[in-house]
Amino acid sequence: MPELSLFVWWLIGGVSSLFLLLAIYLYFFSYRPRAVENCEIVSNDERKTLPAGKTLKVMTWNQEFFGGRNHVYFFDLPMDKGKRITVEEAEMKRNRDHLIKVVKSESPDVLLLQEVDEGSSRTRYHDQEGELAKKLKDYPYRTSAYYVKSAFHPHRHILRPWRMKLVIFSKYSIDEAKRYQLAVKPALWIVRLFYLKRCVLEARIPLSKGGHLSVMNTHLDAYAQGSNTMAKQVKGVKRLLDERTEAKAPWVLGGDFNLLPNDMARKQLTKDQAELYNPHTELSY
């Protein structure tokens, strides 16, 4: 009996140690942003305000981590059924150079980017924001916000680092930048810990006659059918817009909403395509 008791205590100790290691892993490797956070601003020393009466040109682009549209990546399909996982170096360079060429040609005042990778295994650990900054010299002001940030992501197709963010490039100064957390898709608690933390990134650009223009960038959820996640996220974005409207503060919003403009649009899709969207567009909320 004493030997059995000793074995039981060893077993309890071993299981407790495993739970402790799991708790440490979850704490250090999961991303748990606060509801509102300040974001780092990169700029030169010159302060450049937006002139009164100027027409502002804004470009928004989901760059899809420079992966391009020639492949179906695992997260491009429901249940992660896509085949491709990693982007080839040549593809990334070609897609990055194409984005830079278009931006320089269109010359927007503000550039909103989604799905910008940094130190991710799928994009061979490139700093995509930094690479763009070196080429887009006309945009000395920028800020960014993560919506995936994991040194080791437990998804079966990843199992390595994954970091992805929203980025705003601007020709004009950014005085303040904030990240606003949106609703997270319902799931088991451990899945929610590592699930994408969708958000809104706001950059406040100073106006020459005083005050600021709020420029907001977002990327809402996809494949959230059967839940009210998208509706909650739309309401979260609308709340931010309403607050600025009530304060008589000018704003502009762009990004990838993963939504249809109206219910009629869904009827024009194939059956398989329509199943990716709820029967009624969340934009009606």
Describe each region flagged by the PLM.
Residues 112-114, 143-145, 252-256:
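Active-site neighborhood of phospho(di)ester-bond hydrolases with catalytic His/Asp-centered motifs
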Residues 82-89, 116-119, 183-192, 219-228:
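Surface-exposed cleft-lining segments at the edges of enzyme active sites
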Residues 172-210:
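Active-site catalytic loop in hydrolytic enzyme cores
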Residues 133-138, 161-177, 203-208:
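Conserved beta strand-loop-helix elements of the APE1-like EEP
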Residues 194, 204-231:
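Metal-dependent phosphoester/phosphodiester hydrolase catalytic core
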Residues 2-135, 146-154:
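N-terminal, active-site-proximal structural segment of metallo-dependent hydrolase catalytic domains
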Residues 63, 116, 220, 255-257:
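Active-site metal-binding loops of divalent metal-dependent hydrolases
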Residues 224-285:
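Metal-dependent phosphoesterases centered on the DNase I-like endonuclease/exonuclease/phosphatase
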